[in-house]
């Protein structure tokens, strides 16, 4: 494990996010967009979603496939709108105190009621990432988090740079996950991006990834072909012999 690899707990206030996305008439909530962005930052050790699942049956399978634990908060038990919020807060603070190795909490909600939770987590030296929907997220919540990611930005960041390169579909799949991982490292402010760092990020995003599946004897060979296709530029470190990614096309 890299020393800077975050150990993440993800908590999803599903109703808040689902309603926010529903207001964007052309959007359907895709949990994978959030999880993939978090996997660029580290390992997700805990994944929980809170809501009345009898009202959101259409989403249950996607959440189960993503290995998210569904916490049932029946609507009939609501005392106002805060029952799911209260359970999420209790679970997050319990995890904060009982699992010291979890250093990052990702809270998916736009509700200002979570601002005290964010403050308490930060008091306990936890890094807090917020995720929400534009125009339905509290400014107070955004300002309280160490980092805030809007769902619409996740959609906008989905790029398909390989269409114009006429690359076979199987190899394009490999290059796309590599390039998205390099962009993730750039977003995290990494000034030197080593091939090994890219490989670690790729494996978090796609645990089954193996360069041999795409016809390459090593990850370096895959990167070399990407350079030949002008997808990126490589620079070999003279001391270690390892590759640095110097530029993305």
Regions found by a protein language model. Give the residues of each.
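Acidic beta-strand-to-loop metal/phosphate-binding motif
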Residues: 50-52, 103-110, 117, 121, ...
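N-terminal regulatory modules in eukaryotic regulatory proteins
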Residues: 131, 161-249
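Intrinsically disordered, low-complexity linkers and terminal tails enriched in Pro/Gly
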Residues: 1-4, 152-172
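Short, structured coil segments at secondary-structure junctions
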Residues: 66, 124, 143-145
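Domain-level signal for Mg2+-assisted phosphodiester chemistry and nucleotide/NA-binding surfaces
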Residues: 1-97, 117-119, 127
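Short, glycine/polar-rich helix-capping loops at beta-to-alpha or helix-loop-helix junctions
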Residues: 56-60, 133-141
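Contiguous mid-protein beta-loop-alpha structural module that forms a pocket-lining wall or clamp
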Residues: 137-156
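Short, well-ordered beta-strand core segments
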Residues: 70, 105, 128, 148-149
């Amino acid at each position: 494990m890299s020393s800077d690899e975050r150990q993440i707990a993800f908590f999803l206030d599903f109703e808040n996010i689902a309603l926010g996305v529903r207001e964007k008439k052309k959007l359907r909530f895709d949990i994978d967009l959030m999880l993939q962005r978090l996997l660029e930052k580290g390992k997700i050790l805990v994944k929980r979603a809170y809501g009345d699942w009898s009202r959101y049956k259409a989403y249950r399978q996607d959440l189960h496939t993503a290995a998210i634990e569904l916490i049932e908060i029946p609507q009939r038990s609501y005392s106002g709108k805060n029952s799911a919020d209260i359970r999420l807060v209790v679970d997050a603070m319990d995890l904060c105190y009982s699992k010291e190795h979890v250093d990052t909490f990702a809270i998916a909600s736009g509700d200002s009621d979570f601002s005290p939770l964010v403050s308490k987590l930060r008091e306990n030296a936890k890094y807090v990432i917020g995720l929400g929907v534009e125009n339905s997220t509290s400014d107070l919540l955004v300002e309280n988090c160490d980092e805030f990611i809007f769902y619409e930005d996740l959609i906008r960041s989905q790029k398909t740079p390989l269409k114009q390169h006429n690359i076979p579909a199987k190899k394009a799949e490999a290059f796309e996950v590599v390039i998205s991982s390099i962009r993730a490292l750039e977003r995290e402010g990494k000034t030197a991006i080593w091939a090994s760092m890219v490989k670690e990020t790729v494996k978090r995003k796609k645990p089954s990834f193996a360069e041999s599946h795409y016809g390459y004897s090593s990850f370096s060979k895959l990167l070399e072909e990407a350079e030949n296709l002008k997808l990126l530029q490589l620079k070999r470190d003279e001391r270690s012999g390892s590759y640095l990614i110097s530029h993305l096309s």
